[in-house]
Structure formats: C-alpha cells, structure tokens
C-alpha cells in the first residue's frame, strides 16, 4: 500500500502527523548540529544551510521542470521573494550560534509537507498562507519546547527565524505551483477578523513568555487565544467553507500553544 492509495483525508492526516513529529525531532537534533559545529568549526553552519537550501530548491525546480504543465509557468516573483525571505532568516540568526541557521531549511521543509496536506482542500493564495502559517506556528511550538528543555532557551529571535523559513519556503513552493490546482478561492471579512484574533492571541502569549524565564507562566496570557475556538464553534456557519480546513489547521496549531503555561506548573520543569 502506498500513500497514493489512501483517501485524501488520510493522506492529509499522515502529512500533518509528519509535521508534528518533525518538531520534537528538530529540537533534539541540536546536539548533533552542535557536535558537527565543534568538529568542523562555526564556518560549517555559515556555509551548510545556504548550500542545503540551494540544493533543495534546485532539486525541486528540476522535478518541477520535468513535470511542468505549459499552462503553469513559474512565478518568478514569488520564488524570488521566498528566497529573499529565507536568506533574511539566515542573516537574522544569532551570530554566536550559527548552528541555528539550519532552522530556515527545517521550516521550509515543514511548510512543504503542510502544503501537501492542505492541497487536498485548499488552492492558490489560501494554500500559500495557511501552509506557511501552520509551519510558523509549529516554529513557535519549537521554541516553547526549547524553553522547557533543561539545556535550551526560549527566544523570540529564533521564532522569527522559523517564521522566515516557513514563509520563505511557502512563497517558493507557491511560485513553483507545487501540489496546487487552478481553482478560485474567496475569503470573507469574518475569516480575516478571526485570523487577526488568532494572531493577537498568539502574540499575547509568546511575547510576555520572555519575561517568565525561571518562573511559572501565568495562564492569563493564553486566555485571548483560548477564546478563539469558542467563537469559531459558535459561528462556524458564517465562515467561508472553502477555506475551513486551513482555518481549522492553524487554529489547532495556535490554540494548542496554551498548554505550555500549564506545563510550567509541573514539578521538575523550569521554563527558561
């Protein structure tokens, strides 16, 4: 049995699970990257991430050209902007820890997997937006897990690097029309208001968390975020049905962040 023999929903579920598995894998790969940095020097991670990114995108481009439809030329602006985002992410990493540059490539890959999962239900710009947002939110989970790890630290800067990797990758995959079909998509104002609510809720959680290092994170910082799914469940009929899968995915990724203030209350766990 291959993944193609599964139903679209089963394929999407498998892809989502792979995204979720990759986050703790990424968190626990840091000792490997650190060891390689010790052996080969910091210059190794100054050079390696851009090389991997170029090779990965080049490989995807080659595959795209092999199976390209004449009616779907490459969107050079989208690809160029995506590459720019990725290189900004590479430059934005802490210069004292060049090993962290690998996060750009990691989250570009997660965005690609999320794009495949969502492509069964979304198309066009909504597919770009929701897959990139999903990857970026998993990057936030990554940082909270780092904060709970005894040998890591929570940081907004690294979160921004993850975001740039996800959105940069998303723009590249969009420009290459990967897992995409030409179908019209509409977005209502209620969808935009709700997504804005989610964004504010996430910011109200992640920004104050910086000041709780070594402390128990107060649950109040997650209250605005927890209110969002309640509103969605009550008024879900007025949301745009065509993008409901994207809204549900990013809502789940965002609202599940509320578990971290609770985890900081467990004995033996120090958030830093």
PLM region descriptions:
Residues 1-141, 147, 156, 170-171, ...:
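Bulky hydrophobic segments
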Residues 160-164:
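Pore- or pathway-lining transmembrane helices of multi-pass membrane proteins that form conduits
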